[in-house]
Amino acid sequence: MNITHLLTIQKDDLIDILKLSSTKSGSHSYLFVPEVKENKVCLVAHIDTVWDESTLPNKPKAQSTLSKKAQSTSLKQSTVGNKLLIHDTKKGFIYSPNGLGADDRAGVYGVLKLLSTIPEPNTPYVLLTDLEESGGAGAYEAVDLYKEELANCTMFIELDRRGANDCVFYNSEHGEFASYIESFGFVEAMGSFSDISIIAPEFERCAVNLSIGYYNEHTSKEYLNTNEMEVTIARTRKLIKDATKKAKHWEHISTPTRWGYGAEGSVWSDKDFIDCTECGELYFLDDMELLQWTCTKCEAKLSLLNVGI
């Protein structure tokens, strides 16, 4: 499936495809198992978006024409079903006034592309989950349903992070693992939750969430930079091949002094954060330039006055 298809397909239709094409499936999770099963990387992404009919009843109404600004800049548009996509072919951006959902359909595209283009002996496991946006039910199901298969994995890599170069560690992974991931061109950043927060600790493996090119997630201003998406896919391809060759099981060793939340609590200073006064969402101060000082949850403007003291 190409990225346009994944950004426009209804979740129920995607589920029907995954039930037929995956090796094993549950109610909210779908696992692709490689032919060679030992010492493999597992890729993770989630199929649900905040724009699913079941999770967002006030979905924006479909629009059928470009704005005057879009027309004047010669942007391309395509309509699939009830969804309008606007493409900036020069910049490689995709946007939708109906809600884009690149969080995390861009990740789904990335992991499926890697699955289909990396031959053995390097073919990864791929785990696709549902309901990440509402608490991670698919991830909880996966750790029970695929316990035997996922125990073979050396690490977990999720493609579900905004931006271009971020690598996020949720479980206080040790510095050696973080340095290894960064050697492929990523830069450590802070995040709060993704499916690997649930999955990796169950198997005592290190895990990372990588940027996949979307911005302003969970808002009507979300867009996808497809060039950055493809760069992450290329970097991840190199990472998978190298990690499979090394066949090292990256066992999780909690390091409370690293970014994130370890057994002894957070090591972040309050002054590293900004909290939205409207909805309470918490942000890392260094991300403000990228976010244009706008809350991605409620779109309120953020201010240095909201920095913890």
Regions found by a protein language model. Give the residues of each.
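Short linker/helix segments within small regulatory modules
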Residues: L285-T294
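His/Asp/Glu-rich mid-to-C-terminal helical/loop segments that flank catalytic regions of hydrolases
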Residues: N216-I274, G280
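Active-site metal-coordination/substrate-binding segment of hydrolases
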Residues: K37-T123, G135
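Short, cysteine/histidine-rich loop/knuckle motifs that typically chelate Zn2+
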Residues: T277-E278, T296-K297
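Acidic/histidine-rich catalytic neighborhood of metal-dependent amide-processing enzymes
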Residues: N98-I181, E188
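Zn-dependent metallopeptidase/amidohydrolase metal-coordination segment
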Residues: V187-T232
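A non-catalytic alpha/beta surface segment that caps or lines the substrate-entry region
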Residues: M1-C42
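Cys/His-rich microdomains that often coordinate metals
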Residues: G280-Y283, L302
